[in-house]
A protein has these predicted regions:
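Signature aromatic-anchored transmembrane alpha helix within multi-pass, membrane-resident enzymes
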Residues: 55-69, 128-136, 166-179
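Hydrophobic/aromatic-rich transmembrane helices and adjacent perimembrane loops
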Residues: 21-35, 90-116, 139, 145-165
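Short, aromatic-rich membrane-interface segments at the entry and exit
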Residues: 126-129, 145-152, 170-171
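Flexible internal linker/loop segments at domain or repeat junctions
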Residues: 72-120, 129-134
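Extended aliphatic helical segments
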Residues: 7, 53, 68, 84, ...
Length: 179
């Protein structure tokens, strides 16, 4: 409780804005998916379970809202004027690898979509979705949005607080250590 808030003091005092930054929602999804992906590899899943994610009623509604979100990003926000600072590993990777901003936008939107899928596959309990929703909503008001805000917190939540449990055995510990 040294910070006195969920964000570092510098971010809480200077970076919490009254402007909504729509892209930060997707970037926070991609950062969460980056941390969740190794844990997803430890889950035993069948292909049928993977397909169920696309056909659950709640997830269909989520995909509908997410489609509206992606369309609003394309038409109502300016991708080219985003700052380089922050936004996580995928943003930095795409800046390094892709020079054309149109292709970078397409890759970013695809990353947002796959990040949503990873989160929907991994989490099983509604309370976990509520906790994750908090991070997604608060990211809309933080500028610039840094990956360091999630670094230790998401891992601590996964191991302790979240209801979706992981099974740690020799194979799973090797996978988690590798990442």
């Amino acid at each position: 409780y040294i910070w006195g808030a969920i964000l570092p003091p510098d971010a809480a005092n200077h970076r919490f804005t009254k402007t909504i930054h729509l892209y930060n929602f997707g970037y926070s999804l991609s950062i969460l998916a980056f941390y969740i992906f190794p844990f997803l590899l430890t889950k035993k899943m069948k292909f049928k379970n993977f397909l169920d994610v696309f056909f659950k009623k709640n997830n269909l509604i989520t995909f509908l809202f997410f489609g509206v979100y992606l369309i609003s990003l394309i038409f109502f926000d300016n991708f080219e004027n985003l700052t380089v600072l922050g936004k996580g590993i995928f943003h930095k990777l795409f800046l390094f690898v892709v020079t054309d901003s149109f292709y970078r936008l397409i890759l970013t939107l695809i990353t947002f979509f796959f990040s949503l899928i990873i989160i929907l596959i991994y989490f099983e309990k509604k309370i976990d979705y509520l906790i994750i929703s908090y991070f997604l909503l608060i990211s809309l008001f933080i500028h610039p949005f840094m990956q360091e805000y999630f670094d230790p917190l998401i891992l601590v939540l996964i191991f302790t607080f979240l209801k979706t449990k992981i099974k740690i055995n020799y194979k799973n510990s090797f996978i988690l250590t590798l990442f």
